[in-house]
Amino acid sequence: MAHLVKMENGQSQTIQEMLGCIERYNPDHLKILESYVQDQAKNNTYDLEANLAVLKLYQFNPHMLNFDITYTILLKCLTNLPHTDFVMAKCLLLPQQMKDENVQTIIDLADILERADFTLFWQRAEVNRTMFRHITGFHDSIRKFVSHVVGTTFQTIKKDLLKELLGGIEDSTLENWIKRNGWKHQGHDLVVVATQDDKIKTKNITEKIEFENVGALMAQCI
């Protein structure tokens, strides 16, 4: 569903158009933006710029602060790891948001993901599962991030460990993630994540440095 914002002149703009002008800081549009955040959670879509605009409006209008929307924005940021969206959102939080117990729980979950302690993350996620059950695709988004880390860390990995890192998934679900990432089986208990050909190859980089760039420095050394 398209979200339209009504301007003072009676005309309507899309959210993207509104975010490109000074109207993004108009508190009259906050309810529309909050509804847009809820739609992102429901429909498994994501709009970082709009979500950050909501947090910025909370900064300007603390009396309009909505904690449930804050939780949803932070959790949606987690679904876009390894990008730094969560850090940007966290920097916009008000002191009263930072002191909130649920916000602290989400920050803890983010820290756990950042240090790649995925087993602990899934344990904590199970304890706090009601917090993000309204966010469609949350678990698979985290598994996508886990797959990214596994792909940059391992050449081969045991199936049981991979299942654990992906949240204790069933064999059939594991097969889907193996195919999705282009991984291959090796024997009965190993998964090949990267072959020898997949390794990063060294590359010679030549940079042209003009004399004018170092002339002043050389003169100081004489």
Curated annotation (Swiss-Prot):
Q: Which family does it belong to?
A: Belongs to the eIF-3 subunit K family.
Entries under PROSITE patterns matching the protein: PCI
What subcellular locations does the record give? Cytoplasm
Reply yes or no: does the keyword Hydrolase apply. no
Q: Name one Pfam family in it.
A: CSN8_PSD8_EIF3K
Q: Which residues form the PCI domain?
A: 46-208
Q: List the disulfide bonds.
A: none
Q: In its UniProt record, which GO terms are filed under biological process?
A: formation of cytoplasmic translation initiation complex; regulation of translational initiation
- What molecular functions are annotated in GO for this chain? ribosome binding; RNA binding; translation initiation factor activity
- What is the recorded function of this protein according to its Swiss-Prot or TrEMBL entry? Component of the eukaryotic translation initiation factor 3 (eIF-3) complex, which is involved in protein synthesis of a specialized repertoire of mRNAs and, together with other initiation factors, stimulates binding of mRNA and methionyl-tRNAi to the 40S ribosome. The eIF-3 complex specifically targets and initiates translation of a subset of mRNAs involved in cell proliferation.
Name of the molecule in the record: Eukaryotic translation initiation factor 3 subunit K
* Keyword Protein biosynthesis among record annotations: yes
Subunit structure of this chain's protein: Component of the eukaryotic translation initiation factor 3 (eIF-3) complex. The eIF-3 complex interacts with pix.
What do the Gene Ontology cellular component annotations say?
A: eukaryotic 43S preinitiation complex; eukaryotic 48S preinitiation complex; eukaryotic translation initiation factor 3 complex
Organism, as annotated: Drosophila virilis (Fruit fly)
Q: Cite the PANTHER family for this sequence.
A: EUKARYOTIC TRANSLATION INITIATION FACTOR 3 SUBUNIT 11 (PTHR13022), EUKARYOTIC TRANSLATION INITIATION FACTOR 3 SUBUNIT K (PTHR13022:SF0)
